């Protein structure tokens, strides 16, 4: 629970989007246990501050549908395989959270009786209010929708204050900063600017969904010291995307 010595929270309920690739650490495949444990500790710090935390994990560390698609595997089949990869990542993160005595629930868009709970909006909100971390798995349960879109959808459904997208760079740039030294980093962007400039924040479906519902986004470097704690207490870290630059 939050006490008087803790800083005031700007965001009390968040949806954290963490890519599957980030879980690999420096490896080329799979899950780096040190990354998983670090993420669990960061989440625990938020819970102890009184923040309600929902998560969506990607699955790119375990499965990438593009290669199979090029080999002739259908898009729908590939997307379903990718959804299952996100469930595997969710199971790993739940285990890491429970090892530090942090209660967590996995809610899957694809029913998997005996493995994870089926997604249920009202139950998810109840779990969050009770201090449990809720990991939303299997995307939206439908092909052709990314985990970014799933993250924005779940954030809107549970009434989150913001979507936080953890990446390997410190915000959104006008071009790839690794390839273009003149690339400009943005502090603030509107949804319209993201769409018209074609910036790689999230796919257009996710951005349009957030725009329609007024859900702000913040893109940040997960490796930045105390990034999540700084964000929920109102510090600007990375790039904020909203209806205007005064978000």
Swiss-Prot record:
It comes from the Bacteria. Catalyzes the reversible phosphorylation of UMP to UDP. The keyword Transferase applies. It is found in: Cytoplasm. It catalyses: UMP + ATP = UDP + ADP. UMP binds at residues 59, 79, 140-147. Transmembrane segments: none annotated. This is Uridylate kinase. It is an enzyme of class 2 (transferase). Its EC number is 2.7.4.22. Keywords: ATP-binding, Cytoplasm, Kinase, Nucleotide-binding, Pyrimidine biosynthesis, Transferase. One of its GO terms (cellular component) is cytosol. InterPro entries: AceGlu_kinase-like_sf, Asp/Glu/Uridylate_kinase, Uridylate_kinase, Uridylate_kinase_bac. Inhibited by UTP. Its main location: cytoplasm. Belongs to the UMP kinase family. The keyword Iron-sulfur does not apply. It comes from Legionella pneumophila (strain Lens). Homohexamer. Pathway: Pyrimidine metabolism; CTP biosynthesis via de novo pathway; UDP from UMP (UMPK route): step 1/1. SUPFAM superfamilies: Carbamate kinase-like. ATP binds at residues 17-20, 60, 64, 167, 173, 176.
């Amino acid at each position: 629970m939050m006490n008087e010595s803790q800083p005031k929270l700007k965001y009390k309920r968040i949806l954290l989007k963490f890519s599957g690739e980030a879980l690999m650490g420096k490896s080329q495949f799979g899950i780096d246990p040190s990354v998983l444990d670090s993420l669990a500790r960061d989440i625990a710090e938020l819970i102890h501050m009184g923040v309600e935390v929902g998560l969506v994990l990607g699955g790119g560390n375990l499965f990438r549908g593009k290669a199979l698609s090029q080999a002739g595997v259908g898009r729908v089949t590939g997307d379903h395989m990718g959804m299952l990869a996100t469930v595997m990542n969710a199971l790993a993160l739940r285990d890491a959270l429970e090892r530090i005595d942090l209660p967590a629930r996995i809610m899957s868009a694809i029913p998997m009786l005996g493995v994870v709970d089926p997604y249920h909006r009202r139950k998810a909100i109840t779990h969050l209010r009770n201090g449990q971390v809720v990991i939303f798995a299997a995307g939206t349960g439908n092909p052709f929708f990314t985990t970014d879109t799933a993250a924005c959808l779940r954030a809107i459904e549970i009434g989150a204050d913001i979507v936080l997208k953890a990446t390997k760079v410190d915000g959104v740039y006008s071009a790839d900063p690794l390839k273009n030294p003149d690339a400009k980093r943005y502090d603030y962007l509107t949804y319209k600017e993201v769409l018209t400039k074609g910036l790689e924040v999230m796919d257009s479906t996710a951005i349009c969904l957030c725009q329609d519902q007024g859900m702000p986004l913040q893109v940040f470097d997960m490796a930045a010291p105390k990034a999540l704690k700084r964000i929920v207490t109102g510090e600007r870290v990375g790039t904020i995307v909203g209806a205007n630059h005064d978000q």
